[in-house]
Amino acid sequence: MQQNLDKIAERKLPEADQKALQQVFEQTLGLIGNQEDNERKLADLKQQLTDAPKQTLEAQRELSRLKGAPVIPVTQRYATLSVPQLEQIFSERTTEQGELQKALSDANSLIITAQTRPERAQTEISASQNRIQQINGILKLGKNDGKALTPDTRNQLVAEQASIGALINLRRQELAGNSTLQDLGNARHDLVLEKTTRLDQEIQDLQTLINQKRLAQSQETVTKQSLEAQKAGGSSVLATESATNVKLSDYLLRSTDRLNELTQQNLKTRQQLDSVTQSDQALDEQISVLKGSLLLSKI
């Protein structure tokens, strides 16, 4: 078909006829591409359905293990680490949090798609079957809209038939495996949600520990400067310098308190924003899969 399109100029047709024929060839190529795409999707779907029961069971088992495992407090796990080391772990956990949010979004998408698939797929299959019947009638009659079919337009209709047939096969397989895919989505959702809840708490506890260590360092500095000021009582120069250091240390302590407060507020705000973003994504997904459905028209 691509060769026919490449050599269309060799037919030396009038410009209008050549454009019409070019359109037929391009549409036929597009239909062949759609058929191949749906056949690939069908093969991928069959593999997904083969793997899904095992993946569902693994997710359920991992969730059971996770819920049965004791949570070791952050203060116990990381008590000996320095602030920079804790900040590195905090950064890594924040990255993990983003990955879990993506996984949760994917699981939600799988569930929502499975919930709305029966109506959408059955409607599409019905419309596709009607179109195949129309094409069969056209091919049998040898005419389309009163015009006799040419070999090229006949090939286009045959390509459309094959493309629709591949789509019907895909939708039927989706319907047959729908409950399997929904079970997988539910298992993944429950597992990722548990991981997300635990990770959110760990991030909060890490931030609290970082704040505590920062404050302890500042307090240690203040105490040290106060002791030096007491020792320098006999020297006016040293006393003045020590007094200045005490003031600076006190400022450091208050600044640390403020930094900790702002950091904690920022963490809470970011987690709230992540929650809102997750809700928006879920809503967008629901609207997307419901577009054109009877259910949406009733809402």
Where are the regions that the model predicts?
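Flexible, low-complexity extramembrane segments of multi-pass membrane transporters/channels
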Residues: M1-I299
